[in-house]
Every structure is written in C-alpha cells, then in structure tokens.
Amino acid sequence: MKKKNIFVLAFTAALGLSSCDMDKDPYTSYPMDKYMVDVQQFVDARQGLYDPFRTMTTGAATLAPEFMTELFMPMVFFSNTYGDMSSWNIEEANGTIETIWGNYYTMIARANYIIDSYERAKEGRGEFTEEELQKVAVIIGEAYFVRAYSYFNMALLYCDVYDKNQAETQMGLPLQLKYEPSQYAEKYPGRSTLAATYKQVLEDLTSAKSMITSEKSLNYISQHTLQAFEARVALHMKEYGKAAELSAALIGTGKYPLVKSSEDLNNLWLYDEGSEIIWQIYQAVPDEVGGSLGLPFHGQYLGASGYPYAAQRPDFHPTTALLELYGDGDMRAGVYFRQYTLDQWGVPNMFIYTFNKFPGNPLLQKSGLSTDNWYTNISEPFMIAEQYLIAAEAYLEDGNAPEAAKYLNALRSSRIQGYVNETFSDTGDLRQAIRDERTKELVGEGFHFYDLKRWKLGFNRSDTEQVTGVQLDVSYFSKLEIEAGDYRFTWPIPKAEIDANPQLKDEQNPGY
C-alpha cells in the first residue's frame, strides 16, 4: 500500500473529541454514489453519523411513544399534535410512523456507506497507510454503533417483544447491511426473524467495542456509551444477568455520580450539565439545534410577562396518575413539574401543573434561538440514572433481590430528601417499587411505552385529569383504556414501505 501522510495531522486533530469538532461541513459535501478514497472524506463524513441524533432524540421518536401512555392527557384546546398517537389511531399510513421508520433507515444507510468505504479501503482501493486505517477505524466503530442503535430502536417499535424461546419465528426487520441504493424492487430485503435482528445488533455492538477507544466522552460515542447501550439491549432481551453486570460495572467506575441537591438536579435539566450525563448530543445555534421537546408541554408563544412565568396553553398536561407517584421530599417533583397559570379561552385563569423537564436551555436562547423553539434542550440519550434502574430490575429478575434493593435505594437517596433505605420482604412489592421509580425518573424521555409493552401491562386514562374541564373530554383521549398485549403496542410497517418493497407484501404486523 502506498505510503502517504498528508492527512494524518488533520485526522488526529479532528479526532480530538472536543465539542467544537462537531462544527464541520455537512455530510452531503461528499456524494454517496461513490466511495471515499482518502482520510479527510471519512473525517467529514463522520458528521453525518451524528447529525441525525439531534432529530431522533428530540422529536417524534421520543414524544410519539410517550403520548401513547397514561402519563399525559391532551388539553381541550390542543392543536392535535400527536393526536393520532394519543388516541391510538394507529394505521399503516400514519405519517409519524412512516417518518420515524424512514429516518432510522437513513441513519443505517449512512452507516453502511462508511462501513463499506472502509472495507474497500482495506482492500487497497484508495491511498491509505496502515496508520490511517487504524485512525479511521474509530469512525467505523461509530458507524457500527449507529446501525446497532437504529435497528434496536426500530425493533422496539415495529416488532413484538423479544422472546428468546420464540425469536426464531418472530418477525424482525429488513436487514440492509450494505450500501446498495437500488431502483430494482426485487433486490429489497424482506423481514428477518427477530432473532436475526437482535443478533445483528449485538454483532454491530461487538464491532463498535473493538474500534472505539475513548473510555469517556461527552459529545462522542465512547466505550461507556456502548456499555450503557449494551445494558439497555440486554434488559429488553431479558438477559438479566448480563444487564445487571454491565450496568453495575458502569456505575462502579465512579465516573458518573448521582447529583445530590435540587439545584444540581435542576441544572441537569435546565442547563443540560451535570455529572450524570454519559453521552450528550452536540447542539449549537442556529443551524445545529434539535427539536423542542418541551413545546407540547408549554405552548408555542410566550405571554407578556415572558419566560418562564407566562400563562401557558399546552397541548398535553401530566395526569394525576403521574403526579401522584411523587411523594414528600422528592426533588423531581419540583424540577419535572411547575405550576403555571392556564390560559384557556372563556375560562378564568387557573393553576395547573405542566411538565417542566424540558424548560428550554437559556444558553441556547441567549444564542439567538427563535421563540418558536424556546423550549429546546440538549438531548442526553444515555444517563447514569437509567443504569441504576436497569441494575435494580435486572438483579431482581435474576433472583438477587438484595442487590436490586441496593440500587433502587441508592437512586432514591439521591432524589428524595431525608430518604431512609427501604427493605422489601415481598418480591412483588419490590418489583412494583422499581417500576414506579423507573416511571418517575425517566418520564418524558420515551421509555414508558416500551416498558408497558415489555411488562405486558395496559392502562386506563379515566379520571386522571388535574382539573375538571381542561382535558379534551373525548372518550378516545380522556377515557382511553388499553389492554395488555394490544396489537397496537407494535407499530405497523409503513404502507409506503410495503407498497415499494414486494418482499414485505405478506409480512405486515398482525392487526393491520
């Protein structure tokens, strides 16, 4: 292989793992109809792996599943944003479902393009030294993670709950593992088994672990990011011993201590800073900002008194089913919720609790963020609190109740002032306590829908409004009752995808 060194310094600088490295030329600066032939192209293409996370961790992929649960109720004047999801009007032609499917496959295509380019480079196509290939390998590891992350999240939505005893017959996802844009429909893949889908996720994760060298990094995928993700995957696969081991080991590094004060907890969600963050998606005003997770919980426009004390007109408000989970001294109650004046037409102003976990980062606002996107925060796909909850649940289901209680009590001690460790003589009580704690801690982050699905639980929204008359009093919203195992817990393969891919013709999910 020809020796060349002109890109080594540039590449080394680009992998310096500082947040300013994210400020690069757009991914599309290199056309995807030809493979990359030098190191700088890999460096620039790296941006295309990270860009989609700003959308996929702050938009519909997070909020749509959350609004399908009992935790949030539409307001009487809501804009019908996510109305079909909240009412469980789930159809094959649903635009939200189609968009999320397409966005994940876009991420997969970008990952495939980079992985395939690397394989061609190793074959001697292009001018790369062995040293350069080793440096490029970090980016390839990130591409493997992106593909694993995308297929895993799609499996949670578009496939049944993983069951190792049935996975060989459960329907999985169409696995596209090469960058092969084709106009020939007969070349499109059909659905794999769910066993094959999860096998691919784990294989990609193994590849990523062998290539990504940084142990800890705020804005870049690190070994700790991979470990947190692997623990999450293991929990959903019911590999409880593995999940417990991974999460406990990550906690045991001591790199991500739980915050101890309400001020620090508030800063974690207001300013998006704190010791609990494992991986944070880089954002910068004006062009590198994600979606506004807080917008549906507050309303688009600010009143005359300005942020944050204006009267609110939100699309959704937290239900009493959620609010009543928080007891005395729980610091999350004062951070995740705030009492505002409700601005409702024809009704005297009244107080109501809004969901305030995503209040809008003032640093983004001061940088020139439009008021239409005022309630925008920087997303953190992996935080240490989730690992405490994984450890607690996994240890319990693996038969180690004392360890489960230890991690539950550790998280509670950091969140509840004056907390005294609780002992549990009944496994059922401990299981319910862990599930309640998971709901309280992770609310709004997109987990609860998947939790109900894998726990095989339903819900009933009846009589959960905060104030009579402010919720949308329509039976399929406010009186909605969903039974455990409802077929709509598994989303349909989008109609447009089935129409375009003949291999999917007879592979739609049951019920659609």
Segments and roles (model prediction):
Residues 20-72, 299-315, 322-327, 335, ...:
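Membrane-proximal, proline-rich intrinsically disordered regions
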Residues 187, 326-383:
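Flexible, polar/acidic helix-loop-strand segments at domain edges
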Residues 32-33, 62-76, 127-131, 159-173, ...:
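Short, surface-exposed recognition loops and adjoining beta-strand edges that mediate ligand/DNA contacts
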Residues 2-5, 9-12, 16-40, 201, ...:
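Bacterial Sec-dependent N-terminal signal peptides
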Residues 82-158, 192, 205-214, 372-379, ...:
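Conserved, well-structured interaction surfaces
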